[in-house]
Amino acid sequence: MSNETNCTLDFEQSVQLFKEYNLFITAFLLFLTIILQYGYATRSKVIYTLKMIVLWCFWPLNIAVGVISCIYPPNTGGLVAAIILTVFACLSFVGYWIQSIRLFKRCRSWWSFNPESNAVGSILLTNGQQCNFAIESVPMVLSPIIKNGVLYCEGQWLAKCEPDHLPKDIFVCTPDRRNIYRMVQKYTGDQSGNKKRFATFVYAKQSVDTGELESVATGGSSLYT
């Protein structure tokens, strides 16, 4: 007679377990749905921050579950699959940190650790203020706007400024490149009192190099002073 205990749940036990925890499961799934669907930097920074935390937790959770699967495999085939998936999860997680650290060294922005993208936009205003923003890819054109004295780019609130504060060049950094955008067009309203209420600027991609933002200086001042 075997001394091992059979821990397999039958159908009735599974149904009973679901009935006991269905409210928690519903609330948890609703929370994830709201976070993933409405978590955009252009909508709510609070929900977006929660979304980033959830995404950060997914890789360690995947690795932990993979390790458990390796320790308690259902069979030999399951063990091989668990090892492959766990190694893939570990390599992906390490690769994320390597790329994020490289990007952080280039632009010195905490947006570098955004798990949704691999690029950070940067605008150094002529008043010395540094504005960084999340961007999903490296576009050919960037169009920041000023509305009611507030600077927006890619739909994100950046800072309060005047049209004269926009620089000639802005940047989009990736782990291995610095993309330089040159101002090619600007519109600062009409001759009425709307001049300071609305302005739009067009920056076209000018060149690409491997420099860091620390090498950029405006008026003899370091970028981070």
Curated annotation (Swiss-Prot):
Pfam families: CoV_M (PF01635)
Glycosylation sites: 3, 6
CDD domains: gammaCoV_M (cd21566)
Location relative to the cell: Virion membrane; Host Golgi apparatus membrane
InterPro entries: GAMMA_CORONA_M, M_CoV
Membrane topology designation: Multi-pass membrane protein
Highest taxon listed in the record's lineage: Viruses
This protein's record includes keyword Transmembrane: yes
Molecular function as annotated in GO: structural constituent of virion
Gene Ontology CC: host cell Golgi membrane; membrane; viral envelope; virion membrane
Positions on the Virion surface side per record topology: 1-20, 73-77
TM region(s), chain numbering: 21-41, 52-72, 78-98
Chain ranges on the Intravirion side, renumbered to this chain: 42-51, 99-225
Keywords noted in UniProt: Glycoprotein, Host Golgi apparatus, Host membrane, Membrane, Transmembrane, Transmembrane helix, Viral envelope protein, Viral matrix protein, Virion
Record function comment: Component of the viral envelope that plays a central role in virus morphogenesis and assembly via its interactions with other viral proteins.
Family the entry assigns: Belongs to the gammacoronaviruses M protein family.
Record text on subunit structure and interactions: Homomultimer. Interacts with envelope E protein in the budding compartment of the host cell, which is located between endoplasmic reticulum and the Golgi complex. Forms a complex with HE and S proteins. Interacts with nucleocapsid N protein. This interaction probably participates in RNA packaging into the virus.
Name the UniProt record assigns to this protein: Membrane protein
Species in which this protein is naturally found: Avian infectious bronchitis virus (strain Beaudette M42) (IBV)
Gene that encodes it: M
